[in-house]
């Protein structure tokens, strides 16, 4: 337990940040799952639309530091490859 005033403040800030990051992380996973669900359904139009919505969110989470920029690039690359494979 935090004893000093500054330690208590840091503990509160840390908890607030943790909850905020958990919310954003959940949102990110939700949008990625929507794209994957559309891909698994074989619906190219829906998958493309879902990917267009998810792509800036993935980029934003990388900018905010929630995920690494390479992980964001990997997400986008793999999802886009799966969408392109639907047409072929």
From Swiss-Prot:
It holds the Pfam family Ribosomal_S20p. GO terms for biological process: translation. Residues 1-21 have a biased composition (Basic residues). GO terms for molecular function: small ribosomal subunit rRNA binding; structural constituent of ribosome. Signal peptide: none annotated. Keywords: Ribonucleoprotein, Ribosomal protein, RNA-binding, rRNA-binding. InterPro entries: Ribosomal_bS20 (IPR002583), Ribosomal_bS20_sf (IPR036510). The keyword rRNA-binding applies. Residues 1-26 are annotated as: Disordered. GO terms for cellular component: cytosol; small ribosomal subunit. Belongs to the bacterial ribosomal protein bS20 family. Binds directly to 16S ribosomal RNA. This is Small ribosomal subunit protein bS20.
